[in-house]
Amino acid sequence: MSTRVELFCDGACSGNPGVGGWGGILRCGATEKELSGAEWETTNNRMEMTAAIRGLEALTRPCEVVVTTDSQYLVKGMTEWLSGWIRRGWVNSKKEPVLNRDLWERLLELSKTHRIQWTWIRGHNGHAENERCDALARGAIDELRKKGQGRR
């Protein structure tokens, strides 16, 4: 597992819940790939998580991945909370079912394939890749609205 990859990711939501988008940049050396998508009825946290999932799913072999995101929910979930949720049967510290369990389980599966370092950065603070991911997410929302496909 020697290939080192950087994944920058962000999610956006117009209304929460509402129409949402996600954006990601995969970087391996000098090569970059941009990814994005959108959904009609979602939340900001789901889009943040989806950005990371889609980026990790795009990798064709096991890698060392540095995931950089402005989502404390995502970083803390993966580095601090996940083991407790699993130990308690997917119940949080308030004894309530963990939200977005489907996405946490997918991230857990992907973390078995890749060696992942989760890194938090402050959002909307001039970080070039984070700003680009935000633009990708918002662009995906705009595209979905223009197409009007999948509208409930």
From Swiss-Prot:
Positions bound to Mg(2+) 2:
D10, D134
Q: Cite the InterPro entries for this sequence.
A: RNase_H (IPR050092), RNaseH-like_sf (IPR012337), RNaseH_domain (IPR002156), RNaseH_sf (IPR036397), RNaseHI (IPR022892)
Q: Where does it reside? A: Cytoplasm
What is any one of the record's Gene Ontology cellular component terms? cytoplasm
Enzyme Commission number(s) of this protein = 3.1.26.4
Catalysed reaction(s)? Endonucleolytic cleavage to 5'-phosphomonoester
Q: Which domain of life is it from?
A: Bacteria
Annotated ranges, domain RNase H type-1: 1-142
**GO biological process annotation, one example:** DNA replication, removal of RNA primer
This entry's comment on the bound cofactor is: Binds 1 Mg(2+) ion per subunit. May bind a second metal ion at a regulatory site, or after substrate binding.
Q: Which UniProt keywords apply?
A: Cytoplasm, Endonuclease, Hydrolase, Magnesium, Metal-binding, Nuclease
Question: What broad class of enzyme is this?
Answer: hydrolase
List the GO molecular function terms: magnesium ion binding; nucleic acid binding; RNA-DNA hybrid ribonuclease activity
Give the UniProt family note: Belongs to the RNase H family.
Function summary = Endonuclease that specifically degrades the RNA of RNA-DNA hybrids.
Subunit architecture: Monomer.
- What protein name is recorded for this chain? Ribonuclease H
Name of the gene:
rnhA
